[in-house]
Curated annotation (Swiss-Prot):
Taxonomic superkingdom: Eukaryota
Native organism: Schizosaccharomyces pombe (strain 972 / ATCC 24843) (Fission yeast)
Annotated GO biological process: proteasome-mediated ubiquitin-dependent protein catabolic process
Record's protein name: Uncharacterized protein C15F9.01c
Entry GO MF terms: ubiquitin-protein transferase inhibitor activity
One Gene Ontology cellular component annotation held by this UniProt entry: cell tip
């Protein structure tokens, strides 16, 4: 069983800030609606294209991932979390007992992300195994962001996704993150419920058998992002 890494008192503060990094390495084409990321990681060393909708998000995630170092991040909030950048989202944090929801906390609007995450950490620290339900136009951004924050805690996430467009966006984002992450990190497990049945897309540690991945993730996850 993997040991969960404890988080420090300034954990949330670190998550709300990014380093002053190079924001000029993004090129976009209005004709093709394609965005290119010049990734500095030596393991990649090539440009990758992403959907235009991911512009602000990828920029944010790239800088967030740079916080692996011990450098003190500058006091700059995630561009993803600023004002209108992520206003259209509703988050519910709750506990499930005997298939019933209890201790329900609802959050909406620009402050909902940090407030919901703070409430999640409170429940988690009490050993209550909280669940998170995310809805709204910007739900895929928040879902991926929570996934990254949980990764910093040494946990993986299980997503239940129905919308095909959201599936594609999440797949692109998590594929990008996987290339930049340590292979010792817990895997992401995305469960896609479709008319033809249930599909599972996974990205996880090398050597982990596919048939064991669901159990591996289920033992370590208490985030259920439903779209």
């Amino acid at each position: 069983m993997e040991q969960i890494r404890p988080f420090s008192d300034n954990y949330l503060d670190r998550l709300r800030t990014v380093e002053e990094d190079d924001y000029n390495d993004w090129e976009g084409s209005s004709d093709t609606k394609t965005l290119y990321s010049s990734v500095s990681d030596s393991k990649i060393g090539h440009k990758k294209s992403f959907h235009k909708d991911g512009k602000g998000l990828f920029k944010t995630l790239r800088n967030f991932l740079s916080l692996k170092t011990n450098k003190v991040p500058k006091n700059r909030k995630f561009s993803l979390l600023k004002g209108s950048k992520c206003n259209n989202v509703e988050i519910k944090v709750f506990i499930r007992n005997n298939d019933k929801q209890s201790n329900v906390h609802n959050f909406k609007g620009k402050d909902s992300i940090h407030e919901a995450w703070s409430q999640y950490l409170i429940f988690d620290s009490m050993g209550l195994s909280p669940l998170i339900h995310i809805s709204g136009e910007d739900k895929y951004k928040v879902l991926c962001l929570f996934s990254i924050w949980r990764r910093k805690l040494g946990k993986c996430s299980i997503f239940t996704v129905h919308d095909p467009d959201i599936q594609k966006k999440i797949k692109s984002i998590l594929s990008y993150l996987w290339e930049l992450s340590n292979t010792n990190d817990p895997p992401h497990v995305i469960v896609w419920h479709t008319a033809k049945g249930t599909n599972v897309m996974t990205m996880g540690p090398l050597g982990l058998k596919d048939e064991d991945l669901w159990n591996y993730a289920n033992e370590r996850s208490n985030l259920n992002g439903t779209t």
